[in-house]
């Protein structure tokens, strides 16, 4: 936003730096018709900012589906978790990643990566009066068309953290996240519970049905378990 103010000031030969710290409740594109003075300047810069954020999200999704950097022949299996940032800037990023996902890539194809996870939380996006409820509804519309985002319930007993505070700008530290399509990242035997700076070294898939088929003919329980 500040960069757009500077660029507009250079074009108009006007110093708009006094608007650098103007409080914005949301970044939404609007028609400039009928707007004058500072209101028009602010909205024009907001419009440009939203366009740049959208283009950045398009580039991000495109790169995650085209850059082969995993063993040299596979795109990165990437995941992003979002939904609890209620700041104007955070909501803008969330809205534009959802817009990009809804539109699709290329000729309208569904992007496989990054895997997207919406974190749903009471007081944030659970009820109509919550600040991000509008984005949650849009996320539902996007997932109905594109399969993403998936949804993670932060209010589930095993996902709750007593240190989570809606007024804490770093509350994401106390939020569960998921990686890929199977890994829940939060619990920690050797330190505080958090998803920040965490990951997995490898993944394991157990074919329980196959194990049952292989053991179904073994009558002795101990031998069956050992097998």
Language model segments and positions:
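Conserved catalytic cores of very large enzyme subunits
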Residues: 1-227
């Amino acid at each position: 936003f500040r960069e757009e103010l500077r660029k507009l000031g250079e074009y108009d030969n006007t110093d708009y730096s006094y608007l650098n710290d103007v409080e914005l409740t949301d970044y939404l594109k609007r028609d400039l018709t009928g707007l004058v003075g500072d209101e028009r300047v602010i909205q024009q810069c907001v419009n440009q900012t939203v366009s740049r954020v959208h283009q950045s999200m398009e580039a991000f999704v495109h790169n995650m589906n085209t850059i082969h950097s995993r063993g040299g022949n596979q795109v990165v299996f990437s995941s992003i978790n979002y939904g609890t940032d209620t700041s104007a800037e955070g909501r803008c990023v969330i809205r534009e990643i959802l817009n990009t996902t809804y539109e699709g890539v290329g000729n309208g194809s569904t992007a496989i990566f990054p895997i997207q996870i919406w974190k749903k939380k009471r007081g944030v996006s659970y009820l109509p009066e919550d600040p991000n409820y509008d984005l949650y509804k849009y996320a539902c519309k996007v997932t109905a068309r594109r399969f993403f985002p998936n949804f993670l319930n932060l209010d589930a007993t095993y996902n709750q953290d007593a240190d989570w505070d809606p007024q804490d700008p770093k509350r994401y530290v106390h939020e569960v996240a998921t990686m890929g399509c199977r890994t829940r990242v939060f619990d920690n035997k050797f330190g505080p519970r958090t998803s920040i700076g965490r990951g997995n070294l490898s993944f394991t898939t157990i074919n329980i049905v196959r194990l049952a088929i292989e053991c179904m003919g073994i009558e002795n329980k101990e031998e069956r378990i050992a097998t």
